[in-house]
């Protein structure tokens, strides 16, 4: 696996579990002898929902809800087979979406 790169994108609604899982990935990769770049914080995506408070009238009275998606990027340079094995066995929290590109 010489001169290869594994790019891992993490997404979550909570930044605390995102940072925790990013630290686990970096720890695992460093223990197996791979070079690490990251975790790099990517821009937070903010989705805003505006709804009427009342079901029939009072259009001026509205309520707003927002949903934030936090993202991190980790590059693993020159991974060894041991690195790939340990990343496959890694147990991460359920609220984190992981996207891996080789």
Curated annotation (Swiss-Prot):
Disulfide cysteine pairs (residue numbers): none
Gene3D superfamilies the record matches: Ribosomal protein S10 domain
Keyword Ribosomal protein: yes
UniProt GO cellular component terms: ribonucleoprotein complex; ribosome
SUPFAM superfamilies: Ribosomal protein S10
GO annotation, biological process: translation
MF annotations from Gene Ontology: structural constituent of ribosome; tRNA binding
Alphabetical keyword list: Ribonucleoprotein, Ribosomal protein
PROSITE patterns assigned to the protein according to its UniProt record, in alphabetical order: RIBOSOMAL_S10 (PS00361)
Repeat is among the record's keywords: no
Family matches, as NCBIfam families: PRK00596.1, rpsJ_bact
Family named by the database record: Belongs to the universal ribosomal protein uS10 family.
Function: Involved in the binding of tRNA to the ribosomes.
Binding partners and assembly: Part of the 30S ribosomal subunit.
Protein name per its UniProtKB record: Small ribosomal subunit protein uS10
Upper lineage: Bacteria, Bacillati, Bacillota, Bacilli, Lactobacillales
């Amino acid at each position: 696996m010489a001169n290869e790169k594994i790019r891992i994108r993490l997404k979550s609604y909570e930044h605390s579990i995102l940072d925790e899982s990013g630290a686990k990935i970096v720890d695992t990769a460093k223990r197996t002898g791979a070079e690490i770049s990251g975790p790099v914080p990517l821009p937070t995506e903010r989705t805003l929902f505006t709804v009427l408070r009342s079901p029939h009238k009072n259009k001026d009275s509205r309520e707003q809800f927002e949903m934030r998606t936090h993202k991190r990027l980790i590059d693993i340079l020159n991974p060894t087979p041991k690195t790939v094995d340990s990343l496959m066995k890694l147990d991460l929290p359920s609220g984190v979406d992981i996207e891996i590109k080789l």
